[in-house]
């Protein structure tokens, strides 16, 4: 398939025009007329993925490698080194970020990974009506995500009746959350204080931990295309001791 044909398919699946104004989803590298036979799916780009990717292939990531304007590709700093190596190997790059959060990933994570039934949606926020204690909810999340520990903020409510969920970094949405507990990642100190003042408990899922399912979610929609689709092993840049 041509890169343009793959892009058009992805645009039908998850329209790029619904991405946030600050986002940079879409074709970031490549020639629209390039013929593609192999596609790699990954949460992010790293040197191992570029090394293992075949020439003339396509990488589809969740997070855009290019966010801010680059004045040059002179040195070996991030992301310049990756971009130069991909150009050398004629590797194309498409990113599906906030558009895919809205259309697929938040829903997939809530239903298929956490095993909840969605009550309603409000853009990036998924709401679940499911009464349980805060401790029971924490245990449920750890089991479903295979986590040993969670960073939490408990407002003291004994019964959690409504849960809000957002993959990735959802801390900026706290003022809009109408729930007893908010599940997301990358919560900041003052965001936790704001949540406590609003009687909202927080469960920090971790950014990587909540979005690592991007590749398996997208792969199911690409299986009928005449492409070899390879799910790469995305790695969390953080470790816990």
Curated annotation (Swiss-Prot):
Binding site for a divalent metal cation 1: 62, 101, 211
Disulfide bridge positions per record: none
A Pfam family per the record: DUF34_NIF3
Annotated positions binding a divalent metal cation 2: 63, 207, 211
Keywords assigned by UniProt, alphabetized: Metal-binding
GO MF terms held by the record: metal ion binding
GO-annotated cellular components: cytoplasm
Transmembrane segments: none
SUPFAM superfamilies for this protein: NIF3 (NGG1p interacting factor 3)-like
Subunit structure: Homohexamer.
Homology family: Belongs to the GTP cyclohydrolase I type 2/NIF3 family.
Name of this chain's protein: GTP cyclohydrolase 1 type 2 homolog
Native source organism of the sequence: Campylobacter jejuni subsp. jejuni serotype O:2 (strain ATCC 700819 / NCTC 11168)
Lineage: Bacteria, Pseudomonadati, Campylobacterota, Epsilonproteobacteria, Campylobacterales
């Amino acid at each position: 398939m041509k890169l343009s044909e793959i892009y058009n398919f992805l645009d039908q699946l998850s329209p790029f025009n619904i991405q946030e104004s600050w986002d940079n989803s879409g074709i970031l590298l490549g020639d629209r007329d390039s013929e593609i036979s192999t596609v790699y799916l990954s949460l992010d780009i790293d040197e191992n993925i570029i090394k293992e990717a075949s020439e003339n292939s396509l990488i589809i990531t969740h997070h855009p490698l290019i966010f801010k304007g680059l004045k040059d590709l002179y040195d070996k700093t991030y992301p310049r080194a990756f971009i130069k190596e991909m150009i050398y190997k004629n590797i194309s790059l498409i990113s599906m970020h906030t558009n895919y959060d809205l259309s697929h990933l938040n829903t997939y994570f809530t239903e298929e990974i956490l095993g909840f039934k969605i009550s309603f949606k409000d853009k990036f926020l998924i709401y679940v009506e499911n009464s349980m204690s805060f401790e029971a909810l924490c245990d449920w999340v750890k089991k479903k995500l295979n986590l040993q520990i969670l960073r939490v903020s408990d407002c003291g409510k004994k019964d959690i009746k409504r849960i809000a969920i957002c993959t990735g970094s959802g801390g900026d949405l706290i003022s809009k959350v109408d729930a007893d507990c908010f599940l997301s990642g990358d919560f900041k100190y003052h965001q936790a204080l704001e949540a406590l003042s609003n009687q909202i408990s927080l469960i920090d899922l971790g950014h990587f931990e909540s979005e690592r399912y991007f590749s398996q979610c997208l792969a199911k929609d690409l299986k009928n295309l005449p492409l070899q689709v390879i799910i790469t092993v995305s790695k969390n840049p953080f470790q816990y001791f």
